């Protein structure tokens, strides 16, 4: 945590004094001697040095001071609280006794609270568990206690302190007179000044939700000591005089409160200036002076830094509690972890508590518990991704600060903390369960229900009384608490606090009662028993707490003290956090009638850990309105369509057929904690591990080889190792038995046609859906997953075995990884799928069924049985059915089944689910195992059926030639695209019609009609032929048996046939649509950024990269590339860059093929493939694919004919290929273009390739690193380290043109320019001296960081001085290549030039650079070299980045031209 000492004017002088005391008592004494007139803080540098050099001694000293402070504060408190007690007539002695802490115990606690309750954070779930240790147990690494201080030492130090305080008092009285005049001025200036200071120096953005404590150091003592009036005025201005707590305090505590009220805001810091009843307050303040510390907390939540001039109850150490912000009325409870001693247990705040609460016993109680509270807070809230951060949930961006939170909220925070502590402490009192007795405890809880454990209170409604009389089991508390909240608390704040706190116990206490306000009170005790055991709330830290969380749901029923004005989404968020699907369902059911669900509520729900259960609920119960709410809410979110895809799923039970769909759908116990925004890495949310894998019928059936996580940013659709060695032989008979015991056959085409046109109305809803280009480019993964869902009962509807392969690969990818996480899709998703399915189905499945070899399938038969029996049965049945049974989803019976397999499984499983509803998981598993046997038998039946159908398929295959003859006229494209849209609209219309109507079969049939009758003919296919042979008859299970592979083995069937065909047809016909699809088929995905369509990630299997079309068949790859390039001028769906991307993607796959074959590993992966294929591989390996001849003859020719200079991205993963191209087709490859540097950066070959670039004076021209922003700085540092290594050549820099990445750029550049170039002329820099440091910095990720990293290996250091001239010969160039954006023509840069592209933003900079001829050359990207600019014009209008570059990166330029530019007005914004 970063602590900066700066001085807010209204952070009163006490801060400084306390800090001083904490840092070094001796220094404080010295400062008194040296400066008699005023107390002066050490400068920031001094304190920093002291901290860094003397941390250990400092900690000890701080501890001694703290202990002593406690003692003093106790005395003060006793004397003060006696007075206050007189005025507080409402306090019952009885209640006080409950909270009375014996003095001895209190001292022990103060001495070392370590042995009390310790709070442990689970880094995964960010839930907090409290372990109750015996007092005898001492926790290791107690950072809080420091060295315990002997009483003698304490007494001595006390005396010293008191003397010091007397001195201070005298000095301050003198100061008072001098400074009174300036006070008013200070009041006015205070706010501005503090903000300015913050902006200039002290705001540190911290992305981890840490709080940054900024204690401002003020140089002018007069400013340090504003009077109370000044402060109060300020507060009034800031708070608009309407802080209810102030009035309340005055009312409740009469005269004393007036003092206390002032103190509350002042927090006892204006010791010298207390003008309210100066005598008494002053005494106390002088004593307390060293005991309370105030600081300004700047909370850096994620992106935004909220600078609040806040008075906080905070110690001066690395600790923070709640800060009450005067300026924006916001409170932060973010506390960094306690470190290095300090006031971690709140000792310094003790006097403040006493002031606030006016009673020593309550103060002691808070004081006693403060350490646990603080630690709890620091742990809970620190975690950057606590379960449902408000910011993400809202989708509005970051929540900067909570609004309308004032002092009463602080009180509430304390109360919650207190309650939290009491709850933890009095576990047994509160009917919490003990470790292991889940079931028994459930019963007990139900019995005890009559004694709900709330924060029960009696007495007056003042917050003091409320807090003083808190008793967990006091039955009279309801009204008090309710009125308290009504009077003092912003309901939103309470819920936000609870959300932030993420304390399940507290939340449930509050929530349950709150919910009861929404409904007639009923006891629902017995409902949750079964679920409790299953849904352990993700709090796996400690059994006690887990069980408690689960079982507590039953206990709280009748009391409610919140009222109903809380925002629904907040409340719902809290409910979701509890992880109890039952409670959520009750809310969804409308049990709490006034708790209206709005869009954001549903949005939360569908991002929570309960997402899958909620979706199931929505679908099973046909809750159309909820899904609509979600769709609406998603408009707040970027990429809502994709997000929607990742979330919504189709009715499980209705899914027309397979049990599998049902089983997959209805899994209820899914712990998918998915980050609300799926990372770009997997561009489709569906694929990210976060979203629970969509379960599709096949998914369950087909074991998948690759897990999701392995998926690169786009899905190389290609089977990992698939070699598609199958030759395309259109006429070769196809051994795919069209076996389909097919209960429901699609109507014959002719009938369909008539119905089709009569029934379908075209309703344009295109605007909601992505345009055709993106349709084609729509993520293939989603297509695959949804494809299954689209035709749930038609596993037979497959695109070919190749389709099946893809489906398996994609859909199952996930099931392996998340065995239990099956999910389902809604028709909305289906619609998106259709866009692709269409394309795919059409083209792939249909046209191309016939062309492939018999051999492909024969060898794979061995594995099918294993797959079906093991994976299909166990995974699907056990996982999904168990969940179904537990959660009482018994809709399975409704499904109709297509194949015998599915039917039997369905019926068997559904029956089981009825009987086993309430049984434990174990029983369910056994039942399902029995079902597995049934499935095996069924599979055998299917095999027989399939064999019978072989003949039919052969006939169909012969017809393929007809299809091939249907050429597509590219000129028709536009016209066809219009039709295309119309068809999609029809589909959408259908979707609307059937959405949630559980008419899947009808829907499916209609869709098929669309597919085959309207859509496919657009591509010139023979619709009748298609319809008849549309793969509908081929049963998926059968295909799996025939062509499946063993799960977990890398061996897979040959590459997707469909790909081959699509690619083939796309370059035969040069059809843009087909091509677009084929591109996606082999895994290139469109980026959302638009300008960069494709990424080139790798799938690494067995240390081998696989990617691209025709994996392993270089000839076909090149053939396809040929077809692509021949037509590269004519693509209508892709712009120039996209065409480049396509070609590069193909190149990439070629590279990978070459690389894989060179590694000779393909054979191993294809153990079970045909011998023919293996032989092919061997031949290829021997020839090494004749890389040179291939490139010379084909690629060189092709690229030469293409008007586009292909970038080197796709070459990056093969150093051989880079070298080859560099030597042989350098004129065709743009080596300055390295968009995939992101992949490169993570690639093990990063160094070798960069070295190659450096050796050859190549440079990374237009690099855009696709890296998360959080990594940018580390990458900059990494690049910096490479810069050391390669300083004689080139420093690769990857830059975006946005502000944040700009910093990355400036960071790296700053180091180089300032430290290397401008410490000399660049010739005196010798890399040799830095080699060791560079290597160490690499391994540690540049451990030195930005502050210290700068000093390493400067050319002017003594280490380098001996070698200054070693590297100055002409051959070694020190090239610094900067690109902010824009394309540039590569060239070798003369020594010490800085290379910048032409860029509108940077024109001014280019002008400036051009005038420094000796160092810079202006080189616009497309115009050639020209540096003949006139002298710079005056008045360049700079933006922030430009100013930053000019001032900090090129300070010499700044000095030279600083009068020539002005900064834009919004510079600081």
UniProtKB/Swiss-Prot annotation:
Matching InterPro entries: Erythrocyte_Invasion_ImmMod
Compositional bias segments (type: Low complexity): 232-241, 306-327, 430-449, 523-559, 654-693, 1329-1347, 1354-1369
Residue spans of biased composition, Pro residues class: 732-749
Compositional bias annotation for Polar residues: 719-731
Coiled coil regions, renumbered to chain: none
Segments of skewed composition (Basic and acidic residues): 146-180
Start and end residues of each stretch annotated as Disordered: 146-186, 231-255, 306-344, 430-455, 520-560, 654-706, 719-755, 881-958, 1329-1369
Annotated protein name in UniProt: Putative uncharacterized protein DDB_G0280555
Organism of this sequence: Dictyostelium discoideum
